[in-house]
Amino acid sequence: LQANRDIVTEICSKLRGLNQNHVIINAVNPVDVINVVIQDCTGLGRRQIIGFSANDTLRLKWAVAKVLNIGADRVDAICLGEHGEKTVPLFSRIFIDQKHVRLDARQKEAVLLETRSWFSRYQALQSGRTSGWTSGVQLARIIAAIASDSGQVLPCSVILDGEYGYRAVSVGVPARLGARGITEIMELALSGEEQGQLDGAVKKIHSLLQSIRN
C-alpha cells in the first residue's frame, strides 16, 4: 500500500498543472484507498476519478452460473464494497434472464466458495497463462462508456459523498458513466445483512486510509 501510494502520488503531482477537465481511471490496488489518494493529490472532483473494481462482479456472475449450471451471460448480479476480501455480493439482487431469483443457503455457500477460491485453483493449474485479459476487457468498457458518453452503468469504485450513508471513502457501487466521468451513482436497496457487510467493508477501507495518513 505504501509503495503504491508513493508511486501514484509522484505521478499525480505531475497532473496538477494540467487541464482539470480530465477523467482518471485507476486500476492500482488497493483501488478504493488509492482513489482517495488520487483526489487528495490532484484536487479533482470525485466524479472524475473512477476505480476499477468490475472483476468482483464478474466472478460473482460466473460463480452463480456455475452453481446453477447455466450460461454466465444469463446472469445479472453485482458486488459492492471493497475490491478485495470485503467485497459484498448482493444475493438479494440476482437475476436470471431478467427475472429475480432467490438462492437457498446451500447455493449461496457454494457461490461464496467459488468466488473465494477461484484464484488458488487457477494458480494450481500452472498453465503459464494469465487471466488478466478480463481486466483489459472491463477497462475497455469503461473507456468506451466515457468516450461515447453512453450513460452505461458499470460497477466502479467511487468516492462517496452521502450515498449509501458514507462520505470521503471510495467504495464499489454501480455508476453511470459519461464524457465527464461519473454522471450518477446508483443507490440500491440492501438487505440488513448486506448493509452490515458494507459497513464492515467501509470500516476496513477507512482503517487503511488512516494507516497511510498517520
Feature map (PLM): residue ranges:
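C-terminal substrate-binding/catalytic lobe of Rossmann-fold NAD(P)-dependent dehydrogenases
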Residues: 41-50, 56-214
